[in-house]
Amino acid sequence: MKAQPKASHFIGGAFVEDKAGKPLPVIYPATDEEIASLYSATPGIIEAAYAAALKAQGEWAALKPVERGRILRRTAEILREKNRKLSKLETLDTGKALQETLVADAASAADALEFFGGIISGFNGEFVELGGSFAYTRREALGICVGIGAWNYPIQIAAWKSAPALAMGNAFIFKPSENTPLSALALAEAYKEAGLPDGLFNVVQGYGDVGAALVNHRLTAKVSLTGSVPTGRRIMAQAGEQLKHVTMELGGKSPLIVFDDADLESAIGGAMLGNFYSTGQVCSNGTRVFVHKNIRERFIERLVERTRKIRIGDPFDEATQMGPLISAAQRDKVLSYIKKGKAEGATLACGGGVPKLQGFDKGFFIEPTVFADVTDTMTIAREEIFGPVMSVLEFSDEDEVIARANDSEFGLAAGVFTADLSRGHHVIGQIKAGTCWINAYNLTPVEVPFGGYKQSGIGRENGIAALAHYSQIKTVYVEMGKVDSPY
């Protein structure tokens, strides 16, 4: 097969197989072709991963932070050296255009490893003077952390979660999405090549039952999930029973607000980036595009013109700008939302169908879609679609659009396009969302935290904040005089 790995799992520094597990076929979304055959983790595989992690974690945490950081930075170098190879693997696994995976996947993973490897030696506790005595705090590792990944950015998510965890001295067990299991194994090999001690980064494959087993395992100190809100609720409930630490990066239905003084081409570019990149399969996408009534017609006319020029096709052709959705089930789901949008009265401005592509008739492709005349109560304006479907809504004034933007159970992201930066800051200050942009959209440098409000999540990925989520604070009080006791 095109992308068959050495084995399904990576445990204790080596590939491991157990064919007693449930078969896990890997499908190339552009052709519906099976490119690899793996097996879901058995209880024995899961226990082996925990045994390896437990054995390695203590010595790793005892290393100087600068020594841990050096290995992470070397891993980043290896990923960059192998970027093209890894990008091709990610394109096979996800169907995303190679044009995109070359710059957004392994490259972002390398950025995370480099960032956390560089800052960990300066991530220290506090010193508090208390007169004749003093106190200090220590940031200590949690132990064994679990990451559960999504299928839109497999290697990026694996690195975004494991880099801060490992930097802090934890061991890590990662379960990729069953749809995209391959690149996490490649990341494990890169860690090994960089000198990461065996057992610190383990990959176990599987379906939801494997994820549940990891969450519920007695040795799991923390769970970090990237996934849907329903999955997040289940994992929160499971983790809560044992008071485990959690980070939840969940779904969104984010607003992107375009005022009438905005640079039109820039705003349209931001809206397209925030709806069509990765074939619309991005949790932070600004799928509710609020456009001021004064520029609505010009905005939609130019948006449709540019959207129709998006090149859909062979993901390995570097001129291709959009590949397929991840699966037939996901395409069917997106098409059902398009049907619902039309039925509820939205105007289909462009797209909405399945393109005919020579040689890719079995692929899970869909046209980038724009709806106009969308109202706040329509299903396509309320629910996360996770596909290339943009809803354009009209607004008249600032207070109105702020209220409408906030009228959602989600709060992952938001964007504002305006020439008036004072207004931009004011509006963003009123929006209930965790990750926001002014005159940009969906740019996520690893140096800054990423995460949401409300039903969109708990905790943060990236930035110094991520290190806090993979550590616990120990307070030490030091008495320099005699104990003052009433006894």
From Swiss-Prot:
| Residues the entry annotates as binding NAD(+) | G149, A150, W151, K175, P176, S177, E178, S228, V229, P230, T231, G251, C283, E384
Task: Give the UniProt keywords, A-Z.
Answer: Metal-binding, NAD, NADP, Oxidation, Oxidoreductase, Potassium
PROSITE patterns in alphabetical order:
ALDEHYDE_DEHYDR_CYS, ALDEHYDE_DEHYDR_GLU
The UniProt record lists the EC number as 1.2.1.8
Q: Which InterPro entries match?
A: Ald_DH/histidinol_DH (IPR016161), Ald_DH_C (IPR016163), Ald_DH_CS_CYS (IPR016160), Ald_DH_CS_GLU (IPR029510), Ald_DH_N (IPR016162), Aldehyde_DH_dom (IPR015590), BADH (IPR011264)
Q: Source gene? A: betB
Annotated active site residues, numbered on this chain, are K161 (charge relay system), E249 (proton acceptor), C283 (nucleophile), E461 (charge relay system)
GO BP term (any one): glycine betaine biosynthetic process from choline
Question: Under which name does UniProt file this protein?
Answer: Betaine aldehyde dehydrogenase
Q: Which family does it belong to?
A: Belongs to the aldehyde dehydrogenase family.
How many cofactors are bound and how? Binds 2 potassium ions per subunit.
Residues bearing Cysteine sulfenic acid (-SOH) are C283
Pathway, according to UniProt?
A: Amine and polyamine biosynthesis; betaine biosynthesis via choline pathway; betaine from betaine aldehyde: step 1/1
Statement: the UniProt record of this protein carries the keyword S-adenosyl-L-methionine: no
What is this protein's function?
Involved in the biosynthesis of the osmoprotectant glycine betaine. Catalyzes the irreversible oxidation of betaine aldehyde to the corresponding acid.
- Partners and quaternary state? Dimer of dimers.
Tell me the CDD domains matching this sequence.
Answer: ALDH_F9_TMBADH
Q: Which residues bind K(+) 2?
A: L243, K454, G457
Write down the top EC class of this protein.
oxidoreductase
